[in-house]
Amino acid sequence: MKSLRIVLYVLSVVFLTTGAFAKSLKMSRANWDTGYFHAEIYKLGLEELGYKIKKLKDVKPSVFYIGAAQGDVDLWVNGWEANQKAYIDETKGRVIPVGYVAKGGGMQGYLIDKKTAEKYNIKSILDIKKHVKKFDRDNDGKADLVACPPGWGCEKVITSHFEELNLGEFINPLKAEYSATLADTVAAYKNGQSIFYYTWAPNWIFGTLKLGQDVVWIHVPTKSRTKVAATNATMNEINFGFALDDIRPFANKSFLKNNPSAKKFLEIANIPVADISAQNFLMYKGEKSQRDIERHAKDWIKKNQKKFDGWITEARKFNM
């Protein structure tokens, strides 16, 4: 009996890896480019397990969670658990987290250039009100903030800050395509202008605008969170306004139940934040085509082959 089980296991591995009985898997990825790299690594891992995956469709969180709850999509690995909580809650338990891409890896907040912060003694986001002209690039009488597009979890948090602190009286949130707007901000900084933006880590921006050298985090006096010790900030302790978040895979609950091998892979795979940031900087430097991203992912796997193979071997044990 034991020999029969071994034979069946070996055959199942062969069939899955050769695609003889490959299952289709519907995977999406985030519509922000800093999430493309780890999505591609996870895609390659799932394909190694025998899943057939079409080209990943870029979607915003609000669209992903609705689709996953309805079974139109199976999973993505671009979940920010705290940031996207409102969308996650709306699925009523039909879409759940599994594993961690980067536990505690998602840092978020508002930054301004260090020179302006020090010259005008700007410590808090409320201090921007006294210096609107420094950040008003379109001359509408309000400071311009690079914010989040509609449908992103961070947009809801930023909106809550605007409502609680009446930020709309003196700040205009720019909600156009994020990467392009942020690139414009980098150009403005290089031209000597003051800058003000929301961002998160890991992100290519930190390879361009250095924390503590070019830019600093600023305090957000919201009641929803408390001050924490901070480096490269306007004070030794600030309220970032956002939770330190976990980047996680989220999947349809029924899919996970019916696909234990995929579930196990999602549980044990992970990508260091430093590696994600390094790849994001390559994209900023121009290596941003889909072919580039696929190459980056394959190169990462080669450099971490033993670890990657271990994930695959462990996940395959759950095919039976």
Regions found by a protein language model. Give the residues of each.
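Ligand-binding "clamshell"
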Residues: 86-99, 192, 206-236
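Short, polar/charged alpha-helical segment
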Residues: 33-52, 160-162
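Ligand-binding pocket segment of bilobal, Venus flytrap-like solute-binding proteins
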Residues: 67, 73-77, 149-224
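C-terminal functional modules
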Residues: 242, 255-256, 263-320
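Short helix-initiation/N-cap motifs at beta->coil->alpha
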Residues: 32-33, 51-66, 173-184
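Short, well-ordered beta-strand elements
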Residues: 23-34, 51-56, 142-146, 266
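A bilobed periplasmic-binding-protein/Venus flytrap-type ligand-binding module shared by bacterial periplasmic
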Residues: 108-118, 231-232, 246-258, 282
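A conserved helix-loop-strand patch within extracytoplasmic ligand-binding domains
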Residues: 96-147
